[in-house]
A protein has these predicted regions:
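Thiamine diphosphate
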Residues: 1-59, 70
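Flexible, low-complexity linker and terminal segments
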Residues: 41-170
Length: 170
């Protein structure tokens, strides 16, 4: 766990094509098994923006937050904005947290810690993501019939594929 003045952003270097390792590697399943929410940036700018949100989400929820890093993103360069006002972090004040908070504490027995994680922390992270619009509809229509859900580098790949097919936001 974490504290309101701490926060943990756990970076995982995924290697889907096994370019740098003997086996392909994907962190999503390990993060999920450990009840760690995952942020997956699609660009160098999003590494900065979502990194700030990751620390804030960790502090708010008391959870570690996973950060999926793929070579196409982290081994690239870009011009980015470092304006401190670029990312508007909203710390929710309308979520029913336990009276003693969600932060790690000693000497709580492991069952109490696990119950706090399953009863509050996961939902606090989801609430943080909702309030800060971390998951959003990018292209909408009045009568949607089909949806594509994607994140990170695959978001850029899907947008490129749609563009290659001549499909735009209309």
């Amino acid at each position: 766990g974490t504290s309101k003045h701490g926060g943990v952003l756990a970076l995982a270097g995924d290697d889907h094509a096994a370019k740098s390792s003997t086996l392909p590697r994907q962190s999503d399943h390990q993060f999920s098994a450990a009840m760690i929410p995952v942020l997956y940036p699609s660009s160098v700018q999003e590494i900065l923006d979502l990194g700030l949100h990751g620390w804030a989400m960790s502090r708010y929820s008391g959870l570690w937050v996973g950060f999926k890093c793929v070579a196409d993103t982290v081994e690239s360069s870009a011009s980015v904005s470092i304006d401190p006002d670029r990312v508007n972090i909203v710390v929710p004040d309308d979520f029913p947290l336990p009276p003693d908070g969600v932060s790690i504490r000693w000497p709580d027995p492991f069952l109490v810690t696990e119950a706090r994680m399953q009863d509050y922390k996961i939902y606090a992270a989801l609430h943080y993501a909702r309030v800060n619009r971390l998951n959003r509809i990018v292209v909408d229509s009045p009568k949607p019939r089909l949806g594509i859900v994607t994140s990170g580098k695959s978001y850029l790949d899907v947008r490129q594929a749609l563009d290659d097919l001549g499909l735009d936001e209309r």
